[in-house]
Amino acid sequence: MGLPFIVLNYKTYLQGTGQGAMEIAKACKAVSEESGVEIAVAPQLPDIYRVASEVALPVFSQHLDGIGAGSFTGHVFGKCIKEAGAVGTLINHSEKRLTLAEIEASLKAAKEFGLRSIICTNNVPTTAAAAVLGPDYVAIEPPELIGSGIPVSKADPEVVSGSVEAVAKINPRVKVLCGAGISKGEDLRAALDLGSQGVLLASGIVKATDPKAALEDLIRLI
């Protein structure tokens, strides 16, 4: 197994807003260059262009709507985020839930504009359903553990291993990420040992006093 893929979701944390978004992205780039680990960031929409323009690392959108050009006020258009510099998008995060039809439409839009896709799920059945759709990644995140500081890899390891097994049976080209409560090296190591190929995390890094040090701790056991 190669090095893991780490995706850092800024959410709307103050520490990851505006200039803070830039500083965290620079920390991610430094750690990525030092370690060889691919680290992507998902800043707020208005910060995508700035981060993508000034820091050479993968930038994801936190959301994408399954719409095209036209009368869709307030929606997130795939072509717009692609031209702003995004290379991928989260879909169906537990804080931005979508219906199955909306997930399919968002994934279709991501594929249309060449964006890497991460569909977030909350249990093994939803992971299996997401795998059928054929995204690049599914990220298993039980919502009750998000932001808790309690890693899913320890609190509910079966949901991770079960998701890995389900995806392998349905569509082995889809990669599995592990999320919810991930913040330390032990958490990432446990997630990888359960079969995931990376992690989706947020507060443990974004809200850290020293994000670079927190990232270095995260990868120290791989």
UniProtKB/Swiss-Prot annotation:
Protein residues bound to substrate: N9, Y10, K11, I146, G181, A202, S203
EC number, UniProt record: 5.3.1.1
Pathway the protein contributes to: Carbohydrate biosynthesis; gluconeogenesis; Carbohydrate degradation; glycolysis; D-glyceraldehyde 3-phosphate from glycerone phosphate: step 1/1
One of the record's GO molecular function terms: triose-phosphate isomerase activity
Catalytic activity: D-glyceraldehyde 3-phosphate = dihydroxyacetone phosphate
Top enzyme category: isomerase
The keyword Flavoprotein is assigned to this record: no
BP-aspect Gene Ontology terms: gluconeogenesis; glycolytic process
Family annotation (CDD domains): TIM
Record: active site: H93 (electrophile), E141 (proton acceptor)
The keyword Transport is annotated on this UniProt entry: no
Keywords: Cytoplasm, Gluconeogenesis, Glycolysis, Isomerase
Subcellular location: Cytoplasm
Pfam family, one: TIM
Signal peptide, first to last residue: none
GO cellular component: cytoplasm
Function text: Involved in the gluconeogenesis. Catalyzes stereospecifically the conversion of dihydroxyacetone phosphate (DHAP) to D-glyceraldehyde-3-phosphate (G3P).
Subunit structure of this chain's protein: Homotetramer; dimer of dimers.
NCBIfam families, per the entry: PRK04302.1 (NF003302), tim (TIGR00419)
The family this protein is said to belong to: Belongs to the triosephosphate isomerase family.
Name of the protein in question: Triosephosphate isomerase
Organism encoding this protein: Methanosarcina barkeri (strain Fusaro / DSM 804)
